[in-house]
Amino acid sequence: MLTRGFTSIGKIASRGLSSTFYQDAFQLSDQLTEDERSLMLSAREYCQERLLPRVTEAYRTEKFDPSLIPEMGSMGLLGAPYQGYGCAGTSTVGYGLIAREVERVDSGYRSTMSVQTSLVIGPIYNYGSEDQKQKYIPDLASGKKIGCFGLTEPNHGSNPGGMETKATWDETTKTYKLNGSKTWISNSPVSDVMVVWARSARHNNKIKGFILERGMKGLTTPKIEGKLSLRASITGQIAMDDVPVPEENLLPNAEGLQGPFGCLNNARLGIAWGALGAAEECFHLARQYTLDRQQFGRPLAQNQLMQLKMADMLTEISLGLQGCLRVSRLKDEGKVQSEQISIIKRNSCGKALEVARKARDMLGGNGIVDEYHIMRHMVNLETVNTYEGTHDVHALILGRAITGLNGFC
């Protein structure tokens, strides 16, 4: 079994290598507050002790463990960047550090956590009424209830403006009747609470957010089977056939695509940090493997080609983390722009996937065995590079900001 890279300082010293420069090239830890460092270490301890031992079996069997949610809730990892209602109230950087540690173990686990935080608690916190916040957020933050976010549709992925799901007001029952379907929805088959976006005729066909609950008539959430990525998390659909939603479940402070896009921007920040956590793990695993592996009478790591790959990996990871830190600080200062988030989401996910592919190559045949973890990270990152805005969609967002011209056509 391959030793985890960041716990192998003793092995490094035994080889006469006193430097741990590769572990934190730009001294990120020194740029954190004491609370942020403490949070990072607590999250790392939980993830390594509780998540890592079960991830391989979860990936092999494509079986989601719902006990993860209350576990994460008890650690304060759910709803972390929000104040009150049972949430920890961390900085945006603190939330990013949590995502980094969870995804260091598995992108699927981080997806589960970040959906609950940014895409379920987030819209209720930012767009909900006080009654909605009091009713839903404490149970979501504790993990007593699981949530999901319904935006993507079978015919509308990168084009949410084409949304077909409809909300029709029924004056007789004083409810909205929701009809339509959402797909590729993380957590949906096990969710108790669903934040769903639909076009509302009562609001001039504008997009509005609704809180749905398990057990509502006409609501089903079938699981999507056969995934080759994010197998430790659960993904499904939301099917709605005249689902009656009471008026008090309408999110009052969200209108148009700015509602779901605001949620996605918060999620993308966590994804940017998380993807680099997976990249770091691949880098450390490949580094340790090539130090331990003897070929041609010397460590594989002594070959120039291996050192070039590791230099490239360390450079991209270190620069990426600095970008994540800066954009997160800007968000905490109320200065962040959505295009800045697009830069780090696009960069982190694209570079993390490149790092994982290089690391897989460095392990040769062993790179495809789940015992060594890298192949799992690699296929997970294929999805992470796709959701919450694909690599190319974020290029179009940035291109529009650069030129003032809309390339979405």
Curated annotation (Swiss-Prot):
Q: Which cofactor is essential here? A: FAD
Q: Name the keywords, alphabetized.
A: FAD, Flavoprotein, Mitochondrion, Oxidoreductase, Transit peptide
Organism of this sequence: Caenorhabditis elegans
Q: Name one GO cellular component term.
A: mitochondrial matrix
Which Gene Ontology molecular-function terms are recorded? fatty-acyl-CoA binding; flavin adenine dinucleotide binding; glutaryl-CoA dehydrogenase activity
In this protein, the active site sits at 388
Q: Which residues bind substrate?
A: 110-111, 158, 261-265, 268
InterPro entries in the record, alphabetically? Acyl-CoA_DH_CS, Acyl-CoA_Oxase/DH_mid-dom, Acyl-CoA_Oxase/DH_mid-dom_sf, AcylCo_DH-like_C, AcylCo_DH/oxidase_C, AcylCoA_DH/ox_N, AcylCoA_DH/ox_N_sf, AcylCoA_DH/oxidase_NM_dom_sf
Which positions make up the signal peptide?
Answer: none
Top enzyme class of this protein?
Answer: oxidoreductase
Pathway entry = Amino-acid metabolism; lysine degradation; Amino-acid metabolism; tryptophan metabolism
- This protein is called Probable glutaryl-CoA dehydrogenase, mitochondrial
Tell me what reaction this enzyme catalyses. Answer: glutaryl-CoA + oxidized [electron-transfer flavoprotein] + 2 H(+) = (2E)-butenoyl-CoA + reduced [electron-transfer flavoprotein] + CO2
Set out the biological process GO terms recorded for this chain's protein. fatty acid beta-oxidation using acyl-CoA dehydrogenase; fatty-acyl-CoA biosynthetic process; L-tryptophan metabolic process
UniProt-annotated binding residues for FAD? 149-152, 158, 184-186, 390, 408
EC number(s) for this protein?
1.3.8.6
Q: Which family does it belong to?
A: Belongs to the acyl-CoA dehydrogenase family.
Q: Where in the cell is it found?
A: Mitochondrion matrix
